[in-house]
């Protein structure tokens, strides 16, 4: 859920941790879609009357919407808050350096944990698309490609671990005297 995740991320960056949030288009917002869209459209109407180019700026990409939500939870006009915001990176989809990294979820922000099964919710990706984000289709195709690659990579990893286990089993009898010595000195546990 958008707000809960943003609150946890805001705390983490204030504590000095670097945080990267990927697949922002998959974030959920509680409340039905139509209500959330009306809220966002009301936000779009807020502008400087004499010169709208001076702000407030309305970001359309899910990653930027999330980034702005986090910014609202930080003292972003102070040096400390600015430094915290620089420690946060947000992305739509999972771009190359992070597609091979281990990712984690925040259980306290999961929809299944926090919302009753009957409650309505909206997807940030769909909301963004309907208020002017142009890259929903591209992001979706790139995600499909990434998932295919990840599947292949995982299959390869599984075979490698299987082979290494087999190799360990094969040489177990020949290196047993060495392992006994290593265990004696506490190198192997």
Swiss-Prot record:
Transport among keywords: no
MF terms in GO: mRNA binding; structural constituent of ribosome
SUPFAM superfamilies xrefs: Ribosomal protein L13 (SSF52161)
Keywords associated with the record: Ribonucleoprotein, Ribosomal protein
InterPro entries: Ribosomal_uL13 (IPR005822), Ribosomal_uL13_CS (IPR023563), Ribosomal_uL13_euk/arc (IPR005755), Ribosomal_uL13_sf (IPR036899)
Keyword Ribonucleoprotein attached: yes
Disulfide bonds: none
GO biological process, one term: translation
Gene Ontology cellular-component annotations: cytosolic large ribosomal subunit
Gene3D superfamilies: 6.10.250.3250, Ribosomal protein L13 (3.90.1180.10)
Family named by the database record: Belongs to the universal ribosomal protein uL13 family.
Protein name: Large ribosomal subunit protein uL13
Organism: Salmo trutta (Brown trout)
